[in-house]
């Protein structure tokens, strides 16, 4: 993803901080992911050219920690707590997100809709 002067901006970078919800022994994030370098990118509904092997948000639980933090379906996860997520397997991404020792997850995501990103930032 790069920007060429004079061209419209098609994606923005967002920081999202999710405070995990404790349910018994579990810490809940409230979202699901898809993708990874070990997955078939042609099956990714969020990849524009069907070759992107990134990690994408595929579901956000209504009222859950991720929704409260502003995470959206289709967001591409670039970093988790400073760790690069651009070339990881699905399982590596899942493990990084669900580390028990981390009650807060700080994500760096790219979002395809500039209009949605601007609306979200105005609500915060």
Curated annotation (Swiss-Prot):
UniProt-recorded Gene Ontology molecular function terms: beta-catenin binding
Positions of modified residues (Phosphoserine): 61
GO annotation, cellular component aspect: actin cytoskeleton; cytoplasm; fibrillar center; nucleus; plasma membrane
Domain PDZ stretches: 15-112
Alphabetized UniProt keyword annotations: Acetylation, Cell membrane, Cytoplasm, Membrane, Nucleus, Phosphoprotein, Wnt signaling pathway
SUPFAM superfamilies: PDZ domain-like
Keyword Membrane: yes
PROSITE patterns documented for this protein: PDZ
UniProt topology in membrane: Peripheral membrane protein
Pfam families named among the record's database cross-references: PDZ (PF00595)
Main location: cytoplasm
GO biological process: negative regulation of cell population proliferation; negative regulation of protein localization to cell surface; negative regulation of Wnt signaling pathway; Rho protein signal transduction; Wnt signaling pathway
InterPro entries registered for this protein in UniProt: PDZ, PDZ_sf, Synaptic_Scaffolding_LAP-MAGUK, Tax1-binding_p3
Modified residues (N-acetylserine): 2
Assembly and binders: Interacts (via its PDZ domain) with GLS2. Interacts (via its PDZ domain) with RTKN (via the C-terminal region); this interaction facilitates Rho-mediated activation of the FOS serum response element (SRE). Interacts (via PDZ domain) with ARHGEF16. Interacts (via PDZ domain) with KCNJ4 (via C-terminus). Competes with LIN7A for KCNJ4 binding. Interacts (via its PDZ domain) with CTNNB1; this interaction inhibits the transcriptional activity of CTNNB1. Interacts with ADGRB2.
Role played: May regulate a number of protein-protein interactions by competing for PDZ domain binding sites. Binds CTNNB1 and may thereby act as an inhibitor of the Wnt signaling pathway. Competes with LIN7A for KCNJ4 binding, and thereby promotes KCNJ4 internalization. May play a role in the Rho signaling pathway.
Protein name: Tax1-binding protein 3
């Amino acid at each position: 993803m790069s920007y060429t002067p004079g061209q419209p901006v098609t994606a923005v970078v967002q920081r999202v901080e999710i405070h995990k919800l404790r349910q018994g022994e579990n810490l809940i994030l409230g979202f699901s992911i898809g993708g990874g370098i070990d997955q078939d990118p042609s099956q990714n509904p969020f990849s524009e050219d069907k070759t992107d092997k990134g990690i994408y948000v595929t579901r956000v639980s209504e009222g859950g920690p991720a929704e409260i933090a502003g995470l959206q379906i289709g967001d591409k996860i670039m970093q988790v707590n400073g760790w690069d997520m651009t070339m990881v397997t699905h399982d590596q991404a899942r493990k990084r997100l669900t580390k028990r020792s981390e009650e807060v997850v700080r994500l760096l995501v790219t979002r395809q809709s500039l209009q949605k990103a601007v609306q979200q930032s105005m609500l915060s």
